[in-house]
Regions:
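Segments that shape or occlude catalytic/ligand-binding pockets
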Residues: 12-229, 238-256, 324-328, 353-412
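Ser/Thr/Gly/Pro-rich low-complexity, disordered linker/stalk segments of secreted
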Residues: 223-238, 777-817
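Secretory-pathway-linked proteins and extracytosolic
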Residues: 184-348, 634-636
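Second-shell loop/turn segments in exported
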Residues: 17-22, 71-73, 103-113, 166, ...
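Zinc-dependent metallohydrolase catalytic domains
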Residues: 143-147, 289-292, 300, 333-336, ...
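Structured lumen-facing ectodomains of secretory-pathway proteins
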Residues: 415-555, 576
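Bacterial N-terminal signal peptides
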Residues: 1-9
Length: 840
């Protein structure tokens, strides 16, 4: 259906015809598409109405990224974007194509048979939203897309935007109404698609990315010996500078587990935030003395109405001193000013660091005032601390440039195991671990629940996963297997069956954990048990047992104090604005998209220290799940280049035990972490993250990952993302780091002959461990690289058992080979793809 192509050329082979004439990147991009339309598999009618949606210029490499939107009959094609990456001299280094080929044939005879109002009612019904007032038309255009603004109908936080789009499917294109609905509470920000002719609901995208533990394997939560937060009796940690002061867990600290807070002064970066963090008018002097400014407004939203709680933005006074007490032995409600201050600080840090590496005004960053530097303003982040709409979660909703994103940070319930007591049969009588879910009622509120445990059968294989409605005997406790659908779906089905509680059995080895998810209609408690305990229970059914509260009164933990979680969520905004350009946020809704991976990786990169090593285990979210800093975190394994600890490869993407999108992102972040360490080993580590990419391998890695998101096509897969980083290195350094990059990806199965298949399908990729032949003998510093760089993933020609892993243990060989291919051309849906090994 779509001509999915990545076209790459060596920069020396495509240059401007006349370098004395100023380069117009937009015209270069238009001309490129016209000249290469046949290579792209596109008919004249496919490109006849293309429009410029965004133009993003990158300072460090001089590349201008031009994003062209496909239209037909005056109506945009959803995700139909060609991105053309133009060098300073007018050369085209690469182009990514997501236009629909031969659209005229599929679009003919489709007509509008439903109004925007009718579509709104149909969308509400499908999304289980109940309008409390009629939908009214507030504005309507006379253009072909019939863009319409509707009243909220009581289901949205504000007006609902609707317009006609062409929606590509697997084999055709449909004329649809797209409605943008931000649900009250902010848990979901839907793009809903309904057939414009029939009103049939065709699908939805959620612009809110969630960081729940739902469908993720992790180690058991355990108490740590971290800081209790009593660090506010003096100015220890004061960095001595003048200006605004914030007592926080500063860069690169991750959480209270790393030690006491410090009072940092004047941390704003002068390039990114030239008038400080409390300015909005571009004139020296703050407009706000609260936790609000050009980049973010931080506050609490305990009542979950998406409006700041009264007085919840701490006031630093005329001196802008934000120094508030923190006692972690108390519940989060007792230290709100300290939590909001930390959230404000880290949102600004993310803004300023990302700005340094290219997420600036023209790229669609988040600012009220763009200070005349391009882009669309009035879109600072609304950072909501201790949001009351959920638990054990965090999220970030990203609209297009010019509309304010929303970050929601939640409290995390203690995951200390709740005792499940089995009374009978006697051979297995005893107490079992069962951490309570982060959604639904608390066992501390309901009290102990006793019943007969029965295995569910929902009638659809695998019948015990509870993903379909089921029935259970009155008074029983349903036992449900993990897998295939969200935890909240399983528990909601149990509630609908009349159960007072539910037990979910893990489907992978390891300890149980506190399940995450958001569904405020779930009113029963639920717990998880391990796979081993689940097998034991199932072998001894029916059994009787009691589930009771076992948290021991531990206070909840506040994700506002975990900078890794904050950085993860903020990066969702970065990746959504950079991929496909800031005028669209519909480019990371495909099955193989890597959004969760970039978010994990930035959390790792910003909290890395010079004492870290490539084999140092790094868990994500360890603080909020009551683990020590070296805990496994909320992913299947901690991040490390040690294959014995983190064995994920490209083939893992197709493993149904790996969740979508978090598990897929975990695989991508693992690959990026390999690249990060190859570059750090080669170029060293810079303690100053604001220095340019030449200062250290960590800075270089951030620059390449950020640039790669601009280079890659809309709706990328893993191969697209790898190629984009290679092209970014060509533009930045002439390809000098190509082999470090190739080795990283090839070690994890994304070598030169890896096949992505469709980026809309996570199951059709083929891994490969080959690198270009030019990368076999190019090392200048072989003594600085251990076997981790050239084995256990197929770097070089290896015999079995011929090298050691990161811990000095022998690694089984992989039979890897070296690819002699440096340039190869293949055809995908009629589009030629030229892959070039970057020059060295």
């Amino acid at each position: 259906m779509c001509a999915l192509a990545w076209v790459a050329v060596a920069p020396s082979s495509v240059t401007a015809a006349n370098r004395s004439v100023p380069v117009d990147p937009v015209q270069v991009a238009r001309d490129y598409v016209q000249r290469h339309s046949q290579d792209l598999g596109l008919a004249p009618s496919d490109i006849a109405e293309l429009a410029v949606s965004s133009v993003v210029s990158s300072r460090d490499n001089g590349v201008t990224h031009v994003y062209l939107q496909q239209r037909f009959a005056g109506i945009e094609v959803d995700g139909g974007i060609i991105n053309v990456n133009v060098l300073k001299d007018g050369g085209v280094i690469s182009a990514g194509n997501r236009f629909v080929a031969n659209i005229a044939a599929d679009a003919e005879d489709q007509a509008v048979g439903q109004t925007a109002v009718e579509a709104a009612y149909a969308a509400a019904e499908h999304l289980s939203l109940v309008p409390t007032e009629p939908f009214q038309i507030l504005a309507r255009s006379d253009g072909p897309d019939q863009a319409t603004t509707l009243s909220s109908g009581g289901i949205a936080t504000g007006p609902i935007e609707a317009k006609l789009l062409w929606l590509p499917t697997s084999d055709t294109v449909r004329l649809v109404w797209r409605l943008v609905i931000e649900e009250i509470g902010g848990e979901h920000w839907w793009n809903a698609f309904l057939d414009a002719g029939t009103g049939t609901f065709l699908g939805q995208d959620d612009m809110v990315a969630h960081d729940t533990r739902d469908a993720i394997a992790a180690g058991i939560a355990r108490p740590d010996g971290g800081n209790d937060g009593n660090d506010d009796d003096d100015d220890r940690g004061d960095d001595g500078r003048k200006g605004a002061a914030y007592r926080v867990f500063p860069l690169p600290m991750e959480s209270p587990s790393d030690g006491p807070r410090r009072l940092v002064r004047d941390p704003a970066n002068r390039q990114a935030s030239p008038f400080g963090w409390h300015d909005t008018d571009g004139v020296r002097g703050p407009e706000f003395t609260i936790t609000r400014g050009n980049n973010v407004h931080a506050y609490t939203d305990v009542d979950a109405n998406n409006v700041p709680d009264a007085g919840s933005s701490p006031d630093g006074g005329t001196q802008l001193r934000f120094d508030f007490p923190l006692d972690l032995r108390q519940p989060p409600a007792k230290y709100q000013p300290a939590a909001v201050t930390n959230l404000f600080y880290w949102n600004n840090i993310m803004h300023d660091v990302a700005y340094r590496y290219g997420f600036d005004e023209s790229a669609g960053n988040f600012q009220v005032n763009n200070y005349g530097r391009g882009g669309v303003g009035n879109d600072d982040v609304r950072a909501e601390a201790q949001d009351g709409s959920g638990r054990n979660n965090a999220n970030f909703g990203t609209p297009v440039d010019g509309f304010r994103p929303r970050m929601q940070m939640f409290e995390w319930r203690s995951s200390a195991p709740n005792p499940i007591t089995v009374h009978a049969p006697s051979p297995i009588a005893g107490t079992y671990f069962g951490p309570m879910a982060g959604f639904g009622a608390s066992l501390g509120t309901t009290g102990p629940i006793t019943g007969t445990v029965v295995l569910v059968n929902d009638g659809v294989p695998p019948t015990s996963d509870g993903c379909q409605p089921f029935t259970v005997p009155a008074g029983s406790i349903p036992l449900i297997d993990r897998g295939l659908c969200l935890f909240v779906i399983k528990v909601k089905n149990a509630q609908n069956a009349g159960a007072a509680t539910a037990i979910v059995a893990n489907n992978v080895p390891g300890a149980p954990f506190a399940m995450g998810g958001v569904d405020q209609t779930i009113l029963i408690p639920s717990v998880m048990i391990s796979q081993a305990d689940g097998s034991l229970f199932k072998a001894n059914l029916p059994l009787t047992g009691t589930i009771a509260d076992g948290t021991g009164g531990n206070p909840d933990r506040d994700s506002d104090l975990d900078s890794g979680v904050i950085a993860h969520e903020y990066t969702h905004g970065i990746s959504n604005r950079l991929t496909g350009g800031p005028a669209t946020v519909a480019c990371l809704n495909n099955a193989e998209q890597m959004g969760e991976g970039w978010s994990d990786w930035f959390a790792l990169a910003l909290t890395a220290r010079s004492s870290d090593r490539r084999t140092t285990p790094r868990g994500i979210g360890t603080y909020v799940i009551f683990q020590p800093p070296n805990g496994d975190g909320i992913r299947p394994t901690p991040y490390t280049t040690n294959m014995a600890v983190n064995p994920s490869t490209y083939a893992s993407v197709a493993d149904v035990a790996i969740s979508q999108p978090h598990g897929i992102g975990y695989v991508w972040a693992t690959m990026l972490w390999e690249m990060y360490w190859n570059l750090v080993d080669h170029h060293g580590f810079s303690r100053d993250i604001y220095k340019d990419w030449k200062a250290g391998g960590n800075n270089l890695a951030i620059q390449l990952v950020m640039d790669g998101m601009k280079f890659q096509p809309c709706r990328p897969g893993f191969v697209d993302g790898r190629n984009a980083i290679l092209q970014a290195d060509v533009a930045l350094t002439g390809g000098k780091n190509a082999c470090d990059i190739w080795r990283a990806f090839a070690k994890r199965g994304l070598g030169v002959d890896a096949s992505q298949g469709s980026s809309n399908n996570r199951f059709d990729g083929v891994q490969n461990f080959n690198v270009p032949q030019s990368c076999l003998h190019d090392r200048d510093d072989d003594d600085d690289h251990d076997c981790d760089d050239d084995s256990a993933g197929g770097i070089g020609t290896l015999d079995d058992n011929d090298c050691d892993d990161d811990n000095g243990h022998e690694v089984a060989g992989t039979g890897a080979t070296i690819s002699a291919v440096t340039i190869r051309q293949v055809f995908v849906n009629g589009a030629r793809i030229r892959e070039t090994s970057p020059p060295r």
